C-alpha cells in the first residue's frame, strides 16, 4: 500500500509491522532510502523463493510418516506459531517435529520376532504405491524398500561384524516370500543398484553417529541381497571405499561396518572376495581393532571356497610377501594368536599366489624369497624360505638363471640355500639335479673370481665355495649300475654253466654237479624230482583212463547247449558291433557336456586328462576290442577246424595226447629261440662296454 504525502510530494512505501525508527527518517532522507529498502525486499524474493528440496527424501520418508502423523494428530501438541518478522518475506523452513514415543516402531526382542511380525502384503502395497507415484525413478523404490525394512525390523543392536552369527545373517532369516519381493524389486531397478548400495552403506554410517541409533538390519539385508547376485558392485570402485575407510580410521565401528558390507561380495564369488580382502582389509592389517575381523574373514572365505582355482592370479608378489612377513616375522603388529591363525592360512595363500602354472611364474617370486633368507631371520621363517626357494628351483627352470644374476649381491643368503640343497639333495628329482649341475658349476666359477679379487664378504664366499664343491661331488659321485651288474652276473652264470657242461660232457662229472652233490642240494632235488615224476605218471595214467570216457559223455551232454550258446554269442556280438558305435558316440557327447560344466572349476591339466579319457573308450574299442574279438573268432575257428581234421570228428585220448605233445614241443622251440636271442644280445652288450 502506498500514499502520496502532501508535504513531500513523493510516494512512500508503507509496511505493516515497521520497526521503530524506520519511518522517522523517511521524510527527511528522501526517496533514495525508500528505493534501497524496496530493492532489499525484492532481493530477498529474487534469490530465495522456496526452501531447499531434500533430494535424499523418499516416498516412505515424505509420505508414509506424514500419513502416520496425520492419523495421530490429536496426540501431538501443535507447534507454537512464531510471529512473522517484518523485515523479511522469506518463508520459514519447516522444522520436522520428531514423533513421540507412541509413534516409533517398538523394538522386538529378537530379529526373528521382527521378521515374523513383518506384514509382507503391506510392504508389497507400499512398494506398488511407490512405483506408481515415482514410475521413472527406481532409486526411490529401492530407498523405500530399505527404509521400510529398517523401520519395521527394530531388534536389539549387534556388533558391526555379526561375528556370532553365520556369514549370511541376517539375510538367512528372511522368508522365501520376502526374498522374492526383494529380488524382484532389485531386478526391476538393476541400473540403480550401485547407487543403492552406496545409499545403504552411507546411511548405516550416519546411523552410527546417533545415540542411540536405529538397528541396521534392514540395510544389511538389502546389501546382502544385492551382493548375492551382483558381487562386482562392491569391487567396482574399491579405491573410493578405501579412502572412506581411512577417513573413519578413528571410529572402529564404522570401519568394521564398511569391511562387513564389502566382504559380503566374497561369499558369492571367491575372486571378488579376494579383491575386497586385498584392496580393503590387507591395507589395514596390523591395526589392533581391525585385524581380527580381517583374518577371520579370510579364514571364512577360504573355508567356503575349497576349490582355489577360481582365485588363481589374484595374489601377486606385492601382496604375497607382506602376508609372509605378517605370518612369520616375530614382534609385528599382530597378536600371537592372530599370527598363528595367519600361519595356518599361509599354505592356501601360497597356492593362490603360485597360480595354475607355477612352472612359469615362480621365478618372479625367487628374488624376494632370496633377499629374506638371511642368517638372522627366525628359524620357522628360514625353513619356509629355503623350502620355497628349493621349490622355485625345482619347478621353474628360469629360477636358476635369476639366482645366477643375484648371486654376487646375496652371498650370505646363497650360502644358506646351497647348504640346504646339499642336505636335501636326495629328495630332489634326478632331472632337476642335472639342470642344477650347470648352475652350481657357474656359481663355483663366480666364487673363484671373487676370491681372486678379495671380496669383502670373504667368509661367505668360502662357505659358498665349499657347498658348491660338496654338491658337485654329489652330482658326479660314482654310483654302481645295479641293473647292468645283475644282468652281467646272470649272463656270467649261464655262460659258466654251459661251459662246465660242455667241457665235462655230463652233469654228474661237471663242477656244478659236484658242488650241488657235496652241498646236499642235488640228492634232495633228485628225490623231489622222482616223487614229482611218479605223481605225474599216476596222474597221466588216470587221465588216460577217465578223460576219454568223460570227454565223450560231456560232449554228448553239452554239445546242444554249446551250439545254442555259440549261436546266441554270434547274434550278441553282431548286435553289439552294429550298435556299439552309436552308444560310444552318445557316451562321447555326455563326456563333452560334463567336461564343459567342469571346465570352469578344474585346472587345465585335469581338463586335458578328461579330454584324453573322452577319447580313450573309442580308441580302446577300435584298436583293442575289435581286433581282439576278430582274433579270438579266428583262433576258435582255426582250433575247431584243426581238431576236426586231426581227430577226424572223434574225441579220443590218443588224439588229444598227440595234439598236446605237438603244442608243448612248439612252445619249447620258441623258448629256446628266445633264450638264444637274449644271450646273443647280452653278449653283444657286454662286448660294447
Curated annotation (Swiss-Prot):
The chain crosses the membrane at residues 480-500, 616-636. It comes from Homo sapiens (Human). GO terms for biological process: apoptotic process. The modification N-acetylalanine is found at residue 2. It is a multi-pass membrane protein. Keywords: Acetylation, Apoptosis, Endoplasmic reticulum, Glycoprotein, Membrane, Transmembrane, Transmembrane helix. It comes from the Eukaryota. It is found in: Endoplasmic reticulum membrane. Belongs to the TMEM214 family. Residues 20-31 have a biased composition (Gly residues). PANTHER family: TRANSMEMBRANE PROTEIN 214. Critical mediator, in cooperation with CASP4, of endoplasmic reticulum-stress induced apoptosis. Required or the activation of CASP4 following endoplasmic reticulum stress. Its main location: endoplasmic reticulum. Constitutively interacts with CASP4; required for the localization of procaspase 4 to the ER. One of its GO terms (cellular component) is Golgi apparatus. This is Transmembrane protein 214. Glycans are attached at residues 269, 307. Residues 1-37, 70-107 are annotated as: Disordered.
Amino acid at each position: 500500500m502506498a500514499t502520496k504525502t502532501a508535504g513531500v510530494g513523493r510516494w512512500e512505501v508503507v509496511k505493516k509491522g515497521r520497526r521503530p525508527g524506520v519511518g522517522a527518517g523517511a521524510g527527511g532522507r528522501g526517496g533514495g532510502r525508500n528505493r534501497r529498502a524496496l530493492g532489499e525486499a525484492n532481493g530477498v524474493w529474487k534469490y530465495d523463493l522456496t526452501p531447499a528440496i531434500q533430494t535424499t527424501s523418499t516416498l516412505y520418508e515424505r509420505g508414509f510418516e506424514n500419513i502416520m502423523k496425520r492419523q495421530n494428530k490429536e496426540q501431538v501438541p501443535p507447534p507454537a506459531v512464531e510471529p512473522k518478522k517484518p523485515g523479511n518475506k522469506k518463508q520459514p523452513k519447516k522444522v520436522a517435529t520428531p514423533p513421540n514415543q507412541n509413534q516409533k516402531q517398538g523394538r522386538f526382542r529378537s530379529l526373528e520376532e521382527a521378521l515374523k511380525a513383518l506384514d509382507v502384503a503391506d510392504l508389497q502395497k507400499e512398494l506398488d504405491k511407490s512405483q506408481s507415484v515415482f514410475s521413472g525413478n527406481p532409486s526411490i523404490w529401492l530407498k523405500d524398500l530399505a527404509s521400510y525394512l529398517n523401520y519395521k525390523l527394530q531388534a536389539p543392536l549387534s556388533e558391526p561384524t555379526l561375528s556370532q552369527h553365520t556369514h549370511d545373517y541376517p539375510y538367512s532369516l528372511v522368508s522365501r516370500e520376502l526374498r522374492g519381493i526383494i529380488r524382484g524389486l532389485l531386478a526391476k531397478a538393476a541400473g540403480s543398484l550401485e547407487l543403492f548400495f552406496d545409499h545403504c552403506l552411507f546411511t548405516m554410517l550416519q546411523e552410527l553417529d546417533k545415540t542411540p541409533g536405529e538397528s541396521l538390519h534392514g540395510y544389511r539385508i538389502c546389501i546382502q541381497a544385492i551382493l548375492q547376485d551382483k558381487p562386482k558392485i562392491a569391487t567396482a570402485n574399491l579405491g573410493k571405499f578405501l579412502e572412506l575407510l581411512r577417513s573413519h580410521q578413528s571410529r572402529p565401528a564404522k570401519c568394521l561396518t564398511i569391511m562387513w558390507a564389502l566382504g559380503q561380495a566374497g561369499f558369492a564369488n571367491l575372486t571378488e572376495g579376494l579383491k575386497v580382502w586385498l584392496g580393503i582389509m590387507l591395507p589395514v592389517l596390523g591395526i589392533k581393532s581391525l585385524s581380527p575381523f580381517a583374518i577371520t574373514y579370510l579364514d571364512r572365505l577360504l573355508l567356503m571356497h575349497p576349490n582355489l582355482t577360481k582365485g588363481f592370479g589374484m595374489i601377486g608378489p606385492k601382496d604375497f610377501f607382506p602376508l609372509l612377513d605378517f605370518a612369520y616375522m616375530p614382534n609385528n603388529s599382530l597378536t600371537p594368536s592372530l599370527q598363528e591363525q595367519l600361519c595356518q592360512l599361509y599354505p592356501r595363500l601360497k597356492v593362490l599366489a603360485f597360480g595354475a602354472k607355477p612352472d612359469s611364474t615362480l621365478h618372479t617370486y625367487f628374488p624376494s624369497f632370496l633377499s629374506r633368507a638371511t642368517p638372522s631371520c627366525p628359524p620357522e621363517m628360514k625353513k619356509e624360505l629355503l623350502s620355497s626357494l628349493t621349490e622355485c628351483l625345482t619347478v621353474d627352470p628360469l629360477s636358476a638363471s635369476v639366482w645366477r644374476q643375484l648371486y654376487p649381491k646375496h652371498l650370505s643368503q646363497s650360502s644358506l640355500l646351497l647348504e640346504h640343497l646339499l642336505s636335501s639333495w636326495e629328495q630332489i628329482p634326478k632331472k632337476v639335479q642335472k639342470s642344477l649341475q650347470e648352475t652350481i658349476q657357474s656359481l663355483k666359477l663366480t666364487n673363484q673370481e671373487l676370491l681372486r679379487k678379495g671380496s669383502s664378504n670373504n667368509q661367505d664366499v668360502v662357505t659358498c665355495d665349499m657347498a658348491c664343491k660338496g654338491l658337485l661331488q654329489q652330482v658326479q659321485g660314482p654310483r654302481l649300475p645295479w641293473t647292468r651288474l645283475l644282468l652281467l652276473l646272470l649272463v656270467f652264470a649261464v655262460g659258466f654253466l654251459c661251459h662246465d657242461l660242455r667241457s665235462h660232457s655230463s652233469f654228474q662229472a661237471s663242477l656244478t654237479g659236484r658242488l650241488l652233490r657235496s652241498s646236499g642240494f642235488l640228492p634232495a632235488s633228485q628225490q623231489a624230482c622222482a616223487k614229482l615224476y611218479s605223481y605225474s605218471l599216476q596222474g597221466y595214467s588216470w587221465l588216460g583212463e577217465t578223460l576219454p570216457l568223460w570227454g565223450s559223455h560231456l560232449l554228448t551232454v553239452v554239445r546242444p547247449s554249446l551250439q545254442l550258446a555259440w549261436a546266441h554269442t554270434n547274434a550278441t556280438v553282431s548286435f553289439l558291433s552294429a550298435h556299439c558305435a552309436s552308444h560310444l558316440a552318445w557316451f562321447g557327447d555326455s563326456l563333452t557336456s560334463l567336461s564343459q560344466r567342469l571346465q570352469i572349476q578344474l585346472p587345465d591339466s585335469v581338463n586335458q586328462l578328461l579330454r584324453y579319457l573322452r577319447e580313450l573308450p573309442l580308441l580302446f574299442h577300435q584298436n583293442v576290442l575289435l581286433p581282439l574279438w576278430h582274433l579270438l573268432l579266428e583262433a576258435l575257428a582255426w582250433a575247431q577246424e584243426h581238431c576236426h581234421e586231426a581227430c577226424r570228428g572223434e574225441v579220443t585220448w590218443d588224439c588229444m595226447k598227440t595234439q598236446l605233445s605237438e603244442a608243448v614241443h612248439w612252445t619249447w622251440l620258441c623258448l629256446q629261440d628266445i633264450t638264444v636271442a637274449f644271450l646273443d644280445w647280452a653278449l653283444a652288450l657286454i662286448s660294447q662296454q
